[in-house]
Amino acid sequence: MSAETPITLNIDPQDLQVQTFTVEKLLEPLIIQVTTLVNCPQNPSSRKKGRSKRASVLLASVEEATWNLLDKGEKIAQEATVLKDELTASLEEVRKESEALKVSAERFTDDPCFLPKREAVVQAARALLAAVTRLLILADMIDVMCLLQHVSAFQRTFESLKNVANKSDLQKTYQKLGKELENLDYLAFKRQQDLKSPNQRDEIAGARASLKENSPLLHSICSACLEHSDVASLKASKDTVCEEIQNALNVISNASQGIQNMTTPPEPQAATLGSALDELENLIVLNPLTVTEEEIRPSLEKRLEAIISGAALLADSSCTRDLHRERIIAECNAIRQALQDLLSEYMNNAGKKERSNTLNIALDNMCKKTRDLRRQLRKAIIDHVSDSFLDTTVPLLVLIEAAKNGREKEIKEYAAIFHEHTSRLVEVANLACSMSTNEDGIKIVKIAANHLETLCPQIINAALALAARPKSQAVKNTMEMYKRTWENHIHVLTEAVDDITSIDDFLAVSESHILEDVNKCIIALRDQDADNLDRAAGAIRGRAARVAHIVTGEMDSYEPGAYTEGVMRNVNFLTSTVIPEFVTQVNVALEALSKSSLNVLDDNQFVDISKKIYDTIHDIRCSVMMIRTPEELEDVSDLEEEHEVRSHTSIQTEGKTDRAKMTQLPEAEKEKIAEQVADFKKVKSKLDAEIEIWDDTSNDIIVLAKNMCMIMMEMTDFTRGKGPLKHTTDVIYAAKMISESGSRMDVLARQIANQCPDPSCKQDLLAYLEQIKFYSHQLKICSQVKAEIQNLGGELIMSALDSVTSLIQAAKNLMNAVVQTVKMSYIASTKIIRIQSPAGPRHPVVMWRMKAPAKKPLIKREKPEETCAAVRRGSAKKKIHPLQVMSEFRGRQIY
């Protein structure tokens, strides 16, 4: 065992490719000096020259850089225990090439205009750089050999550990392995930091993590194998862990030498959906002049069919809801038809310079159908993520519990469930990657998913061993280590998937799923089905906990302020109040069902707390989306269902959302509503003009005015069937938010009014505040907007004109009052400062600072169309004699 195995390198010293930052940094000074010596500009500048360096100085710089490298090389050669002969030969070669460069450079500096001498210097410089590079690569190979020697030492101890015969030897060998792992990890980390290739750095980092994770597992499994050598599953676990350690050692060995490791498996078809849709959108825009059916039709149809195949795989997945499956199929058929229509229009326009209107319409329709398909795919993927990552550890806990009780007959069934659970998590993680553009996040997701796939059979083997020997402490310890490892990896995967998933999409889908689960709870309670009640309640708790966790993590990425405080207030209310109340009511209901005393239970209380948990989730989502742009809100609203799940507590929630009903109003009512909205927008533009000049970082009045304006705009959008508000309850909640903002503005403005010494100004400000209070109350009353169905002459006619008109009018009046309040607050603030500054001003309630102008580039950027503009001939320049200029000079007039 003492004899060391000779280390063989797979690095070619003649290959001059620089792989490390260290070699690159050492070469840089010499490259600069040599380049300065031999470089000659092809087009000399017409500006005045500075004094150039003498040739002797340039030569001395090259020699100094070379001798510095030679000194370092000689020290390395003296200390090296390997490659001594190669290093010595390389040093001699560098000296020889350095002398050759010196001779040719002296000849060149004597006659710098003679081309053959210049070419000789260039050749000598290249030869010197090649020799120095070879020397540095040899020095780098010594570092690699040192690392490989530690890999070999770890390998020998690792082989000894696999074959130990008793626990005493096991403990000694494992302690030795731990020390060697520490040394190996240190050298591997240094090599990882020095490598230029990002892929090789990632490979070494992954291998180091694998060694640290699997070494303790190997010790535990070996200990269990010594006690229970007859358990086949323990031997299988040991073989798997040994294989993982061996693979990690191979990766470190290959990556440190710059050798490519095993090729990554090809991406699944679904993983290319996002990029394939992007490519299709780019390829459908063609020039009719150059279009030929033989070229474009087969290629576009082939690309579309590949996309549809990937979408079909997603639609057929077990986690995809029936509704989304049908919609994906419908969108696939629609986009297929849109492509055929587009191709037909291209053929009709072939040879024409400009596109016809029908062709432009077909293009727009194709783009719309592409977006619709992408939207349905996003819905389905978010559904998968929301469902699959709900209870990530439950199948493992069930498997371990069965193993602890020694139920060998049931263990295979639970193992199959656990394996299916792992496969689903990996599948959903890959699906989440398919529509994401976060490359780093996708890489982390795939690494974490691969770890889970590798870990799954090991955990099943450990559970089988525990079921065979349920009283063995060594086997229990092994199972516990695997459990912790699984939990760590599942946590990493969950966080990684959350990072590449839009929080807005996740919250929209989670809100819909919680509403489904709430309805299931109520049905189960009324059907006296305890199992389904417990299952649905558990899903609600899990989804609510996931929402709280993800939103809390999202808020950590923002600076603390009013926005984060508002969001976290709702999250804390959910976790500290609503969920405990819900759990209490569920336990009461389950106890009543178990005792068959349901007639004593007040189910209305259960319905109320169920609705409360849904409303709180909705409030969290609304507060998160407070800072979103209108475009982002419109995109998220597309994710919401166009129908509402029927509530089992009221018959009135059946059918479409209140917002959707607004789009079905008669055209005459729509025109009148549009007139009211136009008047509202005029007032909104006044408010925008009033508040956009002020910096809102230290002015809460401006912040509140902006907030009220945004919410009122959402309410008016609701009356047109648009925007983020879906139901009348959302509009009522929005009116409540406006009322709260108005109350906060009232407090601030009254403080300003109390400090204002001008009685007329103070009186006007207080009057506008009373208007805000009045119109806020009026808006709350008018917020019960709903489309009523009337039966006229046997025809069903929807109408909502009165309530909509009242709502918009109240919003317009309130916005007018806000405009006047902002104006008068500023005027009152200026009077406070002007009058009281001689005696020392009071601390201002808010700071009225003008907003800094938007940054503009110092240099005007050229537009693409300007760079390709036609070049025109300039006017001829007329030379004027200096004497003529002097004769025309009159001087400055003195008055």
From Swiss-Prot:
The modification Phosphoserine is found at residues 56, 160, 637, 647. Gene3D superfamilies: 6.10.250.2510, Alpha-catenin/vinculin-like. Transmembrane segments: none annotated. The keyword Cytoplasm applies. It is found in: Cytoplasm, Cytoskeleton; Cell junction, Desmosome. Interacts with CTNNB1. Interacts with PKP2. PANTHER family: ALPHA CATENIN (PTHR18914), CATENIN ALPHA-3 (PTHR18914:SF21). May be involved in formation of stretch-resistant cell-cell adhesion complexes. This is Catenin alpha-3. It comes from Homo sapiens (Human).
